[in-house]
């Protein structure tokens, strides 16, 4: 969305070979898939697959997050949110700028879904990195409740005991579900990005309004 105004090495997860190739083509900004190309628009309109715990522990996933962040914060074409399908990877992963938090950080969400919409709506201008040069007004819920999966990771560290014996300890975060209530403009960003995961573009919402 545009603003208008320590790992398990070698773990592949469920990423297909073409996605791995796209992710590993570099380390910086990724090429955005847009509606200007029929094949890419068809891809953007597909429903993305959920991520598994093994995906979150893969090198491909970590590099994808790094490159998605570089893409959405690119000064040549900055945004306030991005979804994995926009860079050619059909999985349920988004990054959202949290304007409701101190420092307005970008945060990633695995398998996000909206479990409740407020009845109160707001209408505001939206743009999209995948739909160049188009801005229009869209109605969105003012408040939403989202659920998502925690980012899984495995970290190995070595500790020395009192007897001088070195031992390796693995620390693993659970792939558990979390819920959060989001309000205001940040809620709008979440709705826009989660739409991408379901093959819905903001211009479809404009048509709904009309």
Which residues fall in each region the model found?
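Positively charged
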Residues: 10-210
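Sec-dependent bacterial lipoprotein signal peptides
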Residues: 1-9
């Amino acid at each position: 969305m545009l603003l208008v105004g320590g790992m398990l090495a070698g773990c592949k997860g469920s990423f297909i070979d073409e996605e791995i190739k796209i992710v590993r083509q570099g380390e910086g900004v990724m090429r955005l898939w847009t509606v200007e190309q029929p094949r890419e628009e068809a891809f953007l309109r597909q429903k993305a697959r959920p991520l598994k715990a093994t995906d979150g522990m893969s090198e491909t996933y970590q590099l994808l997050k790094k490159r998605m962040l570089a893409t959405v914060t690119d000064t040549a074409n900055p945004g306030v949110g991005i979804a994995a399908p926009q860079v050619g990877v059909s999985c349920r992963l988004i990054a959202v700028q949290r304007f409701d938090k101190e420092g307005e950080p970008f945060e990633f969400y695995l398998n996000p879904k909206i479990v409740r919409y407020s009845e109160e709506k707001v209408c505001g201008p939206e743009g999209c990195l995948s739909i160049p040069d188009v801005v229009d007004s869209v109605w969105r819920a003012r408040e939403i409740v989202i659920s998502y999966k925690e980012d899984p990771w495995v970290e190995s560290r070595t500790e020395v005991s009192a007897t001088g014996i070195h031992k390796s300890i693995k620390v693993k975060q659970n792939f558990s579900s979390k819920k959060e209530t989001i309000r205001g403009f940040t809620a709008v960003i979440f709705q826009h990005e989660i739409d991408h995961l379901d093959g819905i573009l903001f211009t479809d919402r404009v048509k709904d309004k009309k």
